[in-house]
C-alpha cells in the first residue's frame, strides 16, 4: 500500500502505549516509537511475562513516553522507576510528564481529555518521528 518499511514507527495509547515500549525492544527494524500513558511496571504473569521497565536495556529504537501527572492508574513513582531504568541502560528515550493531565489525556471523547497536554504531546510525537523516523 505504499508504506516504507525503512521508516517503521509506532505509537500507542494506554495498553497500546505499553505495547509500544515492548515492541521497541522486539523489532530491530523499528526507527522510532511514542508511548502515550502506557503502564510501565506490574506483576509478571503468563500473559505478561515482561513489562516496559524490564526491557529498558533492550530498546532497538528511540522511545518517547508521554504521561499524566494526575494519572491514578500509572503512579508517578513508576514513571520515575522507568526513567531510572532508561538512564541506567543509556537508552535513547525521553519521558514527558504533564502535571495537570490524567490518564487518557489525548482522548477528546472522554472527560479526562486535557487539550493543552494533548496538543503539546501530539507536536512532540510528530517532532520525535521527524527526528528519528528516517528520511524519505
Pin down the residues of each PLM region:
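Gly/Ser-rich "nucleophile elbow"/oxyanion-hole loop immediately N-terminal to the catalytic nucleophile
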Residues: 1-11, 15, 132-135
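Short beta-strand immediately N-terminal to the catalytic nucleophile in serine-hydrolase-like folds
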Residues: 10-12, 36, 66
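Active-site nucleophile loop of the alpha/beta-hydrolase fold
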Residues: 34-43
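C-terminal catalytic histidine-bearing segment of alpha/beta-hydrolase fold enzymes
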Residues: 87-136
